[in-house]
Amino acid sequence: MNIRERKRKHLEACLEGEVAYQKTTTGLEGFRLRYQALAGLALGEVDLTTPFLGKTLKAPFLIGAMTGGEENGERINLALAEAAEALGVGMMLGSGRILLERPEALRSFRVRKVAPKALLIANLGLAQLRRYGRDDLLRLVEALEADALAFHVNPLQEAVQRGDTDFRGLVERLAELLPLPFPVMVKEVGHGLSREAALALRDLPLAAVDVAGAGGTSWARVEEWVRFGEVRHPELCEIGIPTARAILEVREVLPHLPLVASGGVYTGTDGAKALALGADLLAVARPLLRPALEGAERVAAWIGDYLEELRTALFAIGAKNPKEARGRVERV
């Protein structure tokens, strides 16, 4: 199966298949925001503005990486980018590996024309560093007119796919390439970063990490849908670090590094919990896929509702901004 066909099948699985975790949850349900009835705060005072990767976002929100390089990629990415521009939030692009292999795929990623001011983050698998070097990374970011580059690390997904399954020496390889002339972050894809993973990254000059915990989309389930047309190994596909635990573990090891929480953080209230646990930003991907097929307005409406819920949740706990949410949570 070529890479373009695989991307098409990924979209199909995410739209039609049962690719969410079936048993594993984000763990956010195990925490309760500490409500404050006398915080002395006005809702209008709650300011979601958040600096990230050299830009100032109007809210601590990123559109998660989804696609590019297949037939619907351009349509989806343009809708997502238009919404990001309108709302002042950031956007992660889908994996750019296909661009390095097939430069003609650039059209489906080229969104800067509709998002001239938005934060755009290019994306490449960490495992691709076995075949690509510094010049390739510079070329990728330049072609996409991106502001930053995220390396995704996804060993379970690759193993189920029977893709790039040799992850030896990749942290050392990344260390050789850094620093680059733009911010670099590392992210999982939905199975979570652990304390041990954070320790492995601790000495690198990274600009951020995205814990991408378990509880939302299981990319192992996606790959089984693509490979078999069904999920044959459901227990295997439940492996991962729940999002809440991933936030706590990574924040303990990396106390000052900007931390993105994704992985089933699908409501503004859960977003507030993630911020309270130690995240700086939130990212959402799959729930925006179908709205993106319907257009930028639908994407903007979904995100707008999310951010209004987030703002209200912060108000309810007496937090004037995302930073003030830190610690305003308790275990149930």
From Swiss-Prot:
Top-rank taxon of the source lineage equals: Bacteria
Q: Where does substrate bind?
A: R6, K7, S95, G96, R97, Q157
Give the GO cellular component terms, alphabetically: cytoplasm
Query: What does UniProt list under activity regulation?
Result: Competitively inhibited by N,N-dimethyl-2-amino-1-ethyl diphosphate (NIPP) and isopentyl diphosphate.
* Known EC number: 5.3.3.2
- Explain the purpose of this protein: Involved in the biosynthesis of isoprenoids. Catalyzes the 1,3-allylic rearrangement of the homoallylic substrate isopentenyl (IPP) to its allylic isomer, dimethylallyl diphosphate (DMAPP).
Record's family? Answer: Belongs to the IPP isomerase type 2 family.
Q: What is this protein called?
A: Isopentenyl-diphosphate delta-isomerase
What species is this protein from?
Thermus thermophilus (strain ATCC BAA-163 / DSM 7039 / HB27)
Taxonomic classification:
Bacteria, Thermotogati, Deinococcota, Deinococci, Thermales
